[in-house]
Amino acid sequence: MAAPARPSAEVGPDHRPPGQEAHPFVPVVVNHHRIDATDLAAWRTPRSDLVREAAPVADVDGTLVFGLVEGPFHEWERRVRVDADETTTGAAGGTARREEPTVDVTETVHFRLAVPVWGPLFSFALRRHLRSGSRTPGSMPWWSPPQVLDARAATVLSLLCVLGAFGGYLGTLITQTITYAARQFDASTTDQGTLLASVRIGVLVSLLVVSVADRRGRRAVLLAAIVGSAVITALGALAPGMVWLGTTQTFSRALTTVVALLIGIIAIEEMPSGARAFAVSVLAMTAALGAGACVANLLYADVAEGAWRVAYV
């Protein structure tokens, strides 16, 4: 059984001995553990959980340096230094006893996540995971996919989540603001129903646009769709009546549907087979985040007549 770890994990820009060159990677996590000597092998073994490490290389001072094989990082380096064994002799009832030998392990991890935009959120979770001292091979934290992502897959998924959040916002906008627009335009509930029905016709248009993606490239069509949807939605802020608003939202909703479809297709293409369900789940969460941000517009939409237009720009 491992001896209790010292409560001395540190996180900061750098924690290297004086005179030693500062490492360019950021951030840095430093852990100090006192463990049983019998458990030392686990610390000298490359990690195979959230990251797959290369076989260690011994530094001049005996420190083991582990590099990156695969993981959601642009940079990763883990250094493990083991101090001399300590053997403690005590007495129990006047009889000398010899305790299990322990060693001091200092682990320094330098990493740079390949997670744009959402990096701070995952950096916080990663630091907590690294400080836990867990060395069970293949044991993944609850917040990570069951299969290791490489830097490209992590970057692509992060950017798709950003686009998904925008798509969730744009796709929810008309249903959350139509009541306020109808009040300003003195439109009846029948007019509102007609507008919402016409907006849903845009789904048919989206199928035509998605078919173009196979010839023109999915990423180019995805970016064009998200930009086009945002621009057309902004035109809705100038609407003098329900017809203008309904027309702009019909095309905007069509492009938003294109965004949702292409995000799903690209995610399936880019993610490893063991992480596709994870990718779908986080994409759904970020789309819900965007929809929730749209609902937040209700806080000011009825402050004044026409205040709902702010949500469109």
Question: Where in this protein do the model-derived segments appear?
Answer:
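Extracytoplasmic
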Residues: 161-187
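Helix-breaking motifs and short loop linkers at transmembrane-helix boundaries and internal kinks
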Residues: 186, 217, 238-244, 272
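Short hydrophobic/small-residue motifs within alpha-helical transmembrane segments
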Residues: 199-201, 289
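Structural signature of the two symmetry-related core transmembrane helices
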Residues: 220-235
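Helix-loop junctions at membrane interfaces in 12-TM secondary transporters
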Residues: 237-248, 304-306
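Cytoplasmic helix-loop-helix junction between adjacent transmembrane helices
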Residues: 248-283
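Glycine-rich segments within core transmembrane alpha-helices of 12-TM secondary carriers
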Residues: 275-303
